[in-house]
Design a protein with these regions (language model features):
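A charged N-terminal "starter" segment
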Residues: 1-145
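Flexible glycine-/small-residue-enriched beta->alpha junction loops
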Residues: 145-154
């Protein structure tokens, strides 16, 4: 599927002329295709067949609320690197329980908030980070769901 095309030398996004969008919204502007996002996500999802999986969109790639909302409605998970990104996912209709918290600079406050909201798991990248997550979880009398991120080139 290609939702961007030319018709009589005019560029179209789905069935709308890009020049019409420029008149209405000004230029420059970003144009996203709902149909293309849905098509791409579904192809990726279907490639896993019956294997259990969670597709996590990297919010740092594009945190546009409209894009996040489309993905949330599809049941997507999200890869976040800050509480701000988690709050954007929630504002867009995403579920904290489908969010993986990555990144090496998680603060104790962020860890606590993520645990309160019930994230899917923390991607832990160092022993010091594991200690920090464990410490916060103990103070909250809970267990922190984790996965260990390994980079063999380091």
């Amino acid at each position: 599927m290609n939702t961007f095309s030319f018709n009589n030398k005019a560029l179209y996004a789905e069935s709308v002329a890009v020049t019409d969008l420029m008149v209405e919204y000004g230029s420059p502007l970003y144009i996203y295709s709902h149909a293309q996002i849905v098509s791409n996500w579904k192809k990726f999802d279907q490639a896993f067949g019956d294997h259990p999986h969670l597709i996590c969109y990297a919010v740092k790639a594009n945190s546009n609320l409209g894009v996040l909302n489309v993905l949330a409605k599809l049941g997507s998970g999200f890869d976040i690197v800050s509480i701000g990104e988690l709050e954007r996912v929630i504002a867009a209709g995403g579920q904290p329980g489908r969010c993986v918290f990555s990144g090496v600079s998680k603060t104790e406050t962020e860890i606590q908030r993520a645990l309160e909201l019930g994230i899917y798991c923390f991607n832990v990248e160092s022993a010091a980070e594991l200690d920090r997550v464990e410490s916060v979880a103990k103070l909250m009398s809970t267990k922190a769901p984790i996965s260990i991120r390994v980079n063999p080139d380091v």
